[in-house]
Amino acid sequence: MLTEQQRRELDWEKTDGLMPVIVQHAVSGEVLMLGYMNPEALDRTIESGKVTFFSRTKQRLWTKGETSGNFLNVVSIAPDCDNDTLLVLANPIGPTCHKGTSSCFGDTAHQWLFLYQLEQLLAERKSADPETSYTAKLYASGSKRIAQKVGEEGVETALAATVHDRFELTNEASDLMYHLLVLLQDQDLDLTTVIENLRKRHQ
């Protein structure tokens, strides 16, 4: 979140009390929407952890998702170099746009975003009926079975690579990634944690 010094340095006078706010997906980097905040909206955003704007049409504070349930959960807030624009990184709950797309700028999602969406779906499957969901059945079988499936798919992926079968390699790699994501969820880990670890190693 913003430090106290950063909040003091925000140039509300320059923006006539309404500061433009760019909301970006914290995982994929996709630009989700543009809105405006006054000081009260910023306070509410920081206090609640959900993106809250000042609606210029309704002339009141408006929390994104207050009607639809499609909230934007705040990860971080940062000012630009001129202190007259804010960048909010957020994890969206559902589509951001009222038209049903992930972004108000159209369906511009990067392919990598699908992994995040798949991960969210796999997390929801934890509470599904094992009789109707393969993923729920996998969770119910326990960690050892899930880990075994990851091992099996890893071997099958490697075998497909050794015979240079690109079609089979694609299929087996897909199975491997799916089961690996299930295993991470089973262990209360997520893809973001793995990405952060890879980033640290790269440094």
UniProtKB/Swiss-Prot annotation:
Subcellular location: Cytoplasm
Region (Phosphoribosyl-ATP pyrophosphohydrolase): 115-203
One GO CC term, this protein: cytoplasm
Keyword Hydrolase carried by entry: yes
One example of a Gene Ontology biological process annotation: L-histidine biosynthetic process
InterPro entries assigned: His_synth_HisIE, HisE, PRib-ATP_PPHydrolase-like, PRib_AMP_CycHydrolase_dom, PRib_AMP_CycHydrolase_sf
Keyword presence, Cytoplasm: yes
Catalysed transformations (reactions): 1-(5-phospho-beta-D-ribosyl)-ATP + H2O = 1-(5-phospho-beta-D-ribosyl)-5'-AMP + diphosphate + H(+); 1-(5-phospho-beta-D-ribosyl)-5'-AMP + H2O = 1-(5-phospho-beta-D-ribosyl)-5-[(5-phospho-beta-D-ribosylamino)methylideneamino]imidazole-4-carboxamide
Pathway: Amino-acid biosynthesis; L-histidine biosynthesis; L-histidine from 5-phospho-alpha-D-ribose 1-diphosphate: step 2/9; Amino-acid biosynthesis; L-histidine biosynthesis; L-histidine from 5-phospho-alpha-D-ribose 1-diphosphate: step 3/9
Cysteine disulfide partners in this protein: none
Keyword terms, alphabetized: Amino-acid biosynthesis, ATP-binding, Cytoplasm, Histidine biosynthesis, Hydrolase, Multifunctional enzyme, Nucleotide-binding
CDD domains xref list: NTP-PPase_HisIE_like
Gene Ontology molecular function: any one: ATP binding
Its EC number(s): 3.5.4.19, 3.6.1.31
Record region (Phosphoribosyl-AMP cyclohydrolase): 1-114
Source species, domain of life: Bacteria
Major subcellular site: cytoplasm
NCBIfam families named among the record's database cross-references: histidine_hisI, PRK00051.1, PRK02759.1
PANTHER family linked: HISTIDINE BIOSYNTHESIS BIFUNCTIONAL PROTEIN (PTHR42945), HISTIDINE BIOSYNTHESIS BIFUNCTIONAL PROTEIN HISIE (PTHR42945:SF9)
Family as reported in the entry's similarity comment: In the N-terminal section; belongs to the PRA-CH family.
Name used for this protein in its record: Histidine biosynthesis bifunctional protein HisIE
Organism from which the protein derives: Escherichia coli O6:H1 (strain CFT073 / ATCC 700928 / UPEC)
